[in-house]
């Protein structure tokens, strides 16, 4: 889990637009963020495998 202070700091707007970065709203992770789903890869995988994200299925070939 990310530190609470870092999550709060990221939510506030920064002085410069370039310094802003995306964080997962569920766990606060700053890396491996998917804009389309607004969450990190770990939370995306967890929710997709449990069937909570509509239209996302596990691929098999």
From Swiss-Prot:
Pfam annotation, one family: Ribosomal_S14
Cofactor: Zn(2+)
Binding residues annotated for Zn(2+), in chain numbering: 24, 27, 40, 43
Family matches, as Gene3D superfamilies: 30s Ribosomal Protein S14, Chain N (4.10.830.10)
Domain of life: Bacteria
InterPro entries: Ribosomal_uS14, Ribosomal_uS14_bact, Ribosomal_uS14_CS, Ribosomal_uS14_sf
One biological process term in Gene Ontology: translation
Cofactor comment: Binds 1 zinc ion per subunit.
Any one GO molecular function term: rRNA binding
Protein family according to the UniProt entry: Belongs to the universal ribosomal protein uS14 family. Zinc-binding uS14 subfamily.
Quaternary structure, from the entry: Part of the 30S ribosomal subunit. Contacts proteins S3 and S10.
Function text: Binds 16S rRNA, required for the assembly of 30S particles and may also be responsible for determining the conformation of the 16S rRNA at the A site.
Annotated protein name in UniProt: Small ribosomal subunit protein uS14
Protein source organism: Geotalea daltonii (strain DSM 22248 / JCM 15807 / FRC-32)
Record lineage: Bacteria, Pseudomonadati, Thermodesulfobacteriota, Desulfuromonadia, Geobacterales
Gene, per the UniProt record: rpsZ
């Amino acid at each position: 889990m990310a530190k609470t202070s870092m999550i709060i700091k990221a939510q506030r707007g920064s002085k410069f637009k370039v310094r802003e970065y995306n964080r997962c709203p569920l766990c606060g992770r700053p890396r491996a963020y998917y804009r389309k789903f607004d969450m990190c890869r770990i939370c995306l995988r967890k929710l997709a495998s449990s069937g909570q994200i509509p239209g996302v299925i596990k691929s098999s070939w």
